[in-house]
A protein has these predicted regions:
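Surface-exposed, short loops/turns at beta-strand junctions within beta-sandwich domains
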Residues: 154-162
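Structural beta-strand segments of beta-rich domains
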Residues: 102-106
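Aromatic sugar-binding surface patches on proteins
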Residues: 144-152
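Short acidic/polar inter-strand loop motif in beta-rich domains
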Residues: 170-179
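Bacterial signal peptide processing site
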Residues: 31-33
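Short, compositionally biased P/S/T/A/G/V-rich stretches that sit at domain boundaries
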Residues: 74-99, 111
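Active-site-adjacent structural elements in enzyme catalytic domains
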Residues: 189-339
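Low-complexity, Gly/Ser/Thr/Pro-rich intrinsically disordered linker/tail segments
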Residues: 420-497
Length: 497
């Protein structure tokens, strides 16, 4: 895993130093009015620059990258590229332990819409602000998404040794490195660690703005498709097993995504399953609460927070029975010593049972919920955010197209259905229902509350409101229903057509 290079995104910022419904709500259904469903297989995402390290000339990689830009719906945004780049890029390599002769994927992610090229070349000196000294074997100028913006390239088979990832400004912007990162390609495969006995997975690092950016970019690429497409998949597992879409495919080096684990979330499960999968792969904290749906005129409420380190806390002050797959005293050598099988069973049972749509409708000022309400802006309506409607449906923001002189901006979101299908939809009132009713709770656009480590107890907990910069308990609600829709449209299309 690469280091956090300190993106200053306003998306999520933890200020804690040292923390490295009534009857309608009760209906709570994932079935929802939507646009006609297209091809269930989903069109292929935008292709990436690809080369075999030390076998393909740089020119072929550039050609492949240039073709990619026309295929991706979330390609270069409409606004002219900026040459200023105040944020350092975050670099990422998949798998976590690259092995000679095997494919790897390289990325750079930043908040800046800068015109730049990502290159992967042999390195003879440590990464620095100075340029690389060898010709790249793969490079791409294809800037995707925004914000955050990502450059992505595939290497079919890298040779063992030291390599350098570098993001460089275009000649039109004066050239010069925006940042670099050294990558080691090994001659040997890393041993697969044993599944932990007591925790779901070990926490190896904490969430940061750069990792939140990476999460957003991952979601955007996972569900990418041409703008006029309406892709649908039979299950989320079909998406995650698509190597081109999922850059975390077999990230742990254990062929974990080839085990055929069933992953079939409904709408309320989908954001939790995506967040848990990303956290499981990267060793990040993950948490979830046990929430009510709201009843007798009272909105939903959440309590009894659980995490990857403490997945079975008491609920309603009563101890939970620990299932056999999570029993720390289980006999060794059984199927639950396989980390991916345990993770899949956690999704299918514990998390699916706990996750429900009431979690997305807790009151805006409530600090006990898994989500917090966003201040609406072009920076916050990014992949990974969720939309919870007042009546029990939940969608995950999957991408956004910027406004052009001739067309309005577009917001894409994906949702799950009770039969496990996942489809992509555009923002419009028929898909994104909104109401303001205290008995139903607070609907609208929200984001996962960051899970942090309490400096006093060393336990994982959810961050309070005061530590989240892009939170607003009033922004989506103060203008009423019409004001909400007007504000979203203003974010998507800030200029008159």
């Amino acid at each position: 895993m690469t280091k956090d290079l300190g993106s200053s995104s306003v998306f999520v910022r933890i200020a804690w130093a040292g923390l490295a419904a009534g009857g309608l709500a009760a209906l709570a259904s994932c079935s929802h009015a939507h646009e006609p469903v297209g091809d269930r297989s989903g069109p292929p995402p935008g292709t990436t620059a690809r080369a075999t390290a030390e076998s393909a000339p740089p020119s072929s990689a550039v050609s492949s990258a240039s073709r990619a830009s026309s295929a991706s719906s979330l390609g270069p945004p409409a606004p002219a590229p900026r040459c200023d780049a105040p944020h350092e890029p975050f670099f990422f390599v998949s798998p976590a332990h690259p092995v000679a002769g095997r494919p790897l994927r390289v990325l750079a992610v930043t908040d800046d819409a800068v015109d730049a090229t990502l290159s992967f070349a042999r390195a003879s000196t440590p990464a620095s602000a100075a340029g690389g000294d060898q010709e790249p074997v793969v490079q791409t100028r294809d800037r995707r998404g925004g914000p955050p913006y990502a450059w992505l390239a595939d290497v079919d088979a890298a040779a063992a040794g030291k390599w350098r990832l570098q993001l460089t400004k275009s000649d039109a912007c004066g050239g010069g490195s925006l940042g670099a990162h050294d990558v080691t390609v090994y001659t040997w495969a890393a041993p697969v660690p044993d599944a932990p006995r007591a925790v779901l997975w070990r926490t190896r690092q904490l969430w940061s703005p750069a990792l939140e950016n990476l999460y957003s970019a991952w979601i955007g690429h996972l569900f990418d498709a041409p703008a006029d497409a309406q892709p649908s998949w039979d299950t989320l597992a079909d998406v995650l097993r698509d190597r081109d879409r999922n850059w975390l495919f077999d990230y742990l080096g254990a062929k974990e995504d080839e085990e055929g684990v069933a992953i079939k979330p409904d709408c309320a499960d989908l954001p939790y399953f995506l967040r848990a999968y990303f956290a499981f792969k990267l060793g990040l904290p993950f948490g979830f609460s046990h929430c009510s749906r709201g009843e007798n005129g009272a909105p939903p409420h959440c309590a009894d927070f659980a995490s990857n380190e403490d997945p079975f806390p008491p609920v309603d002050d009563k101890p939970q029975a620990v299932p056999s797959w999570a029993d720390p005293d289980r006999p060794p050598g059984g199927p639950w010593d396989d980390s991916m099988k345990r993770f899949g069973e956690f999704l299918r049972t514990t998390l699916a049972d706990a996750a429900q749509s009431g979690a997305g409708r807790t009151p805006a000022a409530d600090e006990d919920g898994d989500y917090y309400p966003l201040r609406l802006s072009a920076d916050t309506l990014r992949p990974g955010a969720i939309f919870a409607d007042p009546y029990g449906h939940v969608l995950v923001v999957a991408g956004r197209l910027a406004q052009t002189p001739s067309s309005a901006g577009v917001l894409f979101a994906v949702d799950g259905q009770p039969d496990g299908t996942v489809g992509r939809k555009r923002f419009w009132r028929g898909n994104f229902l909104f109401a303001i009713d205290p008995a139903l709770g607070s609907a609208g656009f929200k984001r996962f509350r960051p899970v942090v480590r309490d400096p006093k107890t060393a336990k994982l907990r959810e961050a309070p409101n005061a530590l989240i910069r892009d939170l607003s308990v009033t922004d989506q609600y103060e203008g009423g229903v019409e004001g909400f829709y007007d504000k979203v449209e203003d974010v998507l299309s800030p200029s008159p057509l």
